[in-house]
Amino acid sequence: MTNLEKMREKLQDQINYHNVLYHQKNKPEISDAEYDELKKKLAEIEPEIYATQESVGAPPDERFSKVEHQEPMLSLENAYDEQGVEKFLSKIKRFLIEDKIEILCEPKIDGLSFSAIYEDGRFVKAATRGDGFVGEDVTHNVATIKGFPKFLQGVQGRLEVRGEIYISNSDFLKLNENDEFANPRNAAAGSLKQLDANITASRPLRYFAYSLIGGAEKSQSEVLNKLEALGFCVNEHQSLTSSLDGMLKFYNEVYNCRYNLDYDIDGIVYKVNDLVLQNRLGNTHKAPRSALAYKFSAVYAKTKLNKIFIQVGRTGVLTPVADLVPVNIGGVLVSRASLHNQDEIKRKDIREGDIVTIKRAGDVIPQIVEVSRDSRLPNTPEFVFPEVCPECGSKVRQVEGEAAVRCPEEFACKAQIIEKLKHFVSKDAFDIVGLGDKQIEFFYDLGLIKQIPDIFTLEERLDEFNLEEQSGWGKKSIAHLLNAIQSRRVITLDRFIFSLGIRFIGQVAAELLADYYVSYDNWYNSMIELSSDNTELVGIDGIGKKVAESLESFFSKEHNIKMLNDLTACLQILPVSSNSSNSVLNNKIIVFTGKLLAMSRGEAKVRAKTLGAKVSSHLSAKTDYLIAGEKPGSKYKKAVELGVEILDEDQWHKVISLGVFK
């Protein structure tokens, strides 16, 4: 066995060892960054093995068959202070035009979400939340949970119960005598996701049910009562209130007694109690508008800041990052923290070698909140922010009024090009299996992939670069990669727009643009004309001036136009298909003016979009309908001049309720 083979085997053994600790025992010994470094080293030695690992996937959920949720299991919007709760309550009141809304308050259990399906009262399937749309089948494992109902008396048809699986603190202490798990949540997750249901049965899993889909209940409080009547465990701590004071009072009461509970909670969940109002509020792209999680205060820990290093992102921003001595904060090993920008470093006087206090709140990136100057060594120098890009050496720039420092060489800076390529192939964009970070860097350095279109012409240039002769690459790994690329030549418009990595164009903005323009040609042609007129783009509901300016800048550069033309010659970009094709509003451009009496402007926009309409604030000859409420503005007069059809509020209600105009 050669030294290279020995090293490869050693790295593979280390990765396998840490996979077991993380995914099965839920007791990681190293940070995510250190784990990624092991995988990168293996990739350098044997890209073929690395590509295979990337396609199969290490997470344990790949071992389970998939279950598609009929209704998405969305996450909740979070608040971390009282102002966030007040904002939530004010927003739903404005949306519904209601002065008083009943809110049900419940503890937020720190466990693992589940869905259980019953057919004619018989338990038939259980699934994890997964990505919210597709979960893992854990039917046999959930069936082993003590006291979990297998049959519901008197229930007909399909009924879905949702809740949270957890392990109590007292049971966790007994289970964790050998210190196998970091915390009760990890223990619950590891126990539920076992291939052998006998192992799950040996673990003290418990659950709370909190949601019912398919019932006849009219409120969340009725849902909880029904669940309890059916034999499900329901959390006893709950409160109904119609005021902000009542919501905050419940939070404080539970916060003060949380350590007396025998299970972990990480906040309070507020839900609009009336299910009809919940339905009217609907969902954003990621969460229901009718609920909020008020997370408990952040967890803090002290550690040493080893070094400050600079990352260059795909838009050229130089971001300082703190490399820390790894510290456990609330069961999570933290080895890096965000420093945001040079102003933040100066304001807090953060220096390398300092003892710092780290704050971690929910899913927010850990931050340095305090520096222990008493512990600082004498003559410790201030951190000097670089005046040139650490990647390409170009002089950096800072736009007046912005905190961000940028490298201006977007087409020449290696770091920016590589980060754009990584973004393009990432999971939420083209999702090309086998083209991970290390592969992108390898192909860039080799000269095979220098710009995005090169990905789809890779096969034509392989002989020129003798990839098969490169260390670790063979016919099999090359074939896998080419097949993965070939399978991604068809993509939806929103994912394509997002994949380009244009500043300010995240997934939400990309989806809004795709929904409005429907096809790539429509979008492209409209963007080309931005320099002369961007009023239509700015008028799209949810698209602001910054997005418009960013798109205008992107499409003003010949390099980007050529890249798009080269790229689209290799692809099929699917137009947006509407779920409301039978709606009279499908693909119609609608503008609102004046005050609506029966519903808020926000709700009216949501209803219009649900029916397939494109909502804009800009009225033009392209507008199909102007919805005019009380005291309409200048848009009414302009609509008359342009011959745009005008609907009053009564006509608008007939459209959204009956689908007719007259």
Swiss-Prot record:
An individual GO BP term: DNA repair
Transmembrane feature ranges: none
Residue ranges of every copy of the BRCT domain listed in the record: 580-662
Xref: InterPro entries: BRCT_dom (IPR001357), BRCT_dom_sf (IPR036420), DisA/LigA_HHH (IPR041663), DNA_ligase (IPR001679), DNA_ligase_AS (IPR018239), DNA_ligase_CS (IPR033136), DNAligase_adenylation (IPR013839), DNAligase_N (IPR013840)
Residues given in the record as Zn(2+) binding sites: C389, C392, C407, C413
Record carries keyword Lipid metabolism: no
Protein name per the record: DNA ligase
This protein's encoding gene: ligA
